[in-house]
Amino acid sequence: MKLAARHPEIVEKLIVIDIAPLPYGNRGHQDVFQGLFAVNAAKPQSRQQAKPILAQQIADPSIVQFMLKSFEPTSPEFFRFNLTALFNNYENLMAWQDVSVSVPTLFIKGGDSPYIKPQDSERILQQFPNASSFTINGCGHWVHAEKPTFVIRAIERFLNKNECV
């Protein structure tokens, strides 16, 4: 979203998956960080070894599975992302300053997710006047992991026809 605001000349269309352009503060990701750092400390050599370590900290099995997709035993922090940098910059990542984005934008929301609420619509349209939205029922925040076929179909329709899906 920030890239589209800062450099609209290089963004033709924008797709945002289950996040609203507003500050989130602490959204309860501490369990995820604790699980990831526990894996880092235990130094497992396989996903099978990492899974129970994550599951001790993260109650939702779908989040455990999603985190395991980035597990890489040969990486310095055992994941394909910089865990320390994410943790150290978490507050900055969760903060938000309003922007103005005119490119066509699709917001995809998980039907059971708390990340985009009905009351957020006005603030979204103030910042993204060319926005449309699509809700995928029966999934939460990890909509792209829970219902990838529906997400891909929504993205394809938006990119190919510039229509609200």
Predicted feature descriptions by range:
Residues 5-9, 126, 153, 157:
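Short, well-ordered alpha-helices that flank and scaffold nucleotide-derived cofactor binding pockets
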Residues 131-165:
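Catalytic active-site module of serine/aspartate enzymes centered on a nucleophile-bearing elbow/loop
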